[in-house]
A protein has these predicted regions:
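ABC ATPase NBD coupling module
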Residues: 70-87
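Conserved ABC transporter NBD signature motif
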Residues: 61-72
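Conserved ABC ATPase signature
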Residues: 141-146
Length: 233
């Protein structure tokens, strides 16, 4: 496995209309590593994802994905191609409520979803199983699915095209407390089997304990990312 960090952020600053700009002093994500970061609200989390993917550039600092700076990509076509390396699991991703869950899962593979081609249907079933979605949901309208199934649908679509880096925005925000740890286990299993690096922007400690190798908290005033203190009693 390469020793080049999957994601590296150094001295990053980006203003976005909040009381303070988004600052990240230093973050290095090893290949295959999973990290949670608490301390970013929904707007800051979206900005973080945009910075990592190069959709937005920082006013200061450097962001590198697999050794390459996002600032080095100046061509729109090249940038679009670079997005293949990212999977983004977010509630901002549109689910077609009137379509079946299978049709929603088929969309990353093409727009021909009525009917779903046999080969694509097989890939959809395998993807659902991998992400912890019971197969009986596939023929049901997506709008009828519970929050846990929808969260796993966002996860499944994010990994469908084999990205190298998975970004999750508050993935358990809509989940019942009883499902948060299991979702963390499901997401960790998916990342492990695919050798995915991942950053989850979440303050959910139960999810983080099941999902992450490291859990960090952003200090907004300085941009420091701190780990929980050890307790000796």
């Amino acid at each position: 496995m390469s020793s080049v960090p999957a994601l590296e952020m150094v001295g990053v600053l980006k203003r976005y209309g909040a009381l303070r700009p988004l600052r990240i002093q230093a973050l290095a994500l090893a290949p295959g590593e999973r990290v949670t970061i608490a301390g970013l609200d929904a707007i800051a989390a979206e900005l973080f994802v945009n910075l990592v993917t190069g959709a937005s550039l920082p006013e200061a600092g450097q962001i590198r994905n697999f050794g390459r700076s996002t600032a080095d990509i100046t061509d729109a076509e090249e940038w679009l191609g670079s997005l293949d390396r990212f999977g983004i699991a977010t509630d901002r991703g549109v689910l077609l409520e009137g379509a079946t869950l299978a049709q929603n899962l088929a969309l990353p593979f093409g727009l021909d979803i009525d009917p779903i081609p046999v080969e694509v249907g097989e890939r959809v079933a395998a993807l659902a199983t991998e992400c912890g979605i019971a197969l009986e949901w596939l023929d049901q309208p997506c709008g009828a699915a519970p929050a846990g199934v929808k969260a796993r649908t966002h996860l499944a679509r994010a990994v469908a095209l084999a990205p190298a880096l998975l970004l999750l925005e508050h993935p358990t925000a809509s989940l019942d407390a009883a499902d948060r740890q299991q979702f963390g286990r499901d997401a960790a299993r998916v990342c492990e089997s695919r050798s995915l690096s991942a950053v989850a922007l979440s303050a959910d400690a139960e999810f983080g304990a099941a999902f992450a190798h490291r859990s960090l908290t952003l200090v907004p005033a300085t941009g420091a990312l701190t780990a929980p203190r050890r307790r000796w009693w």
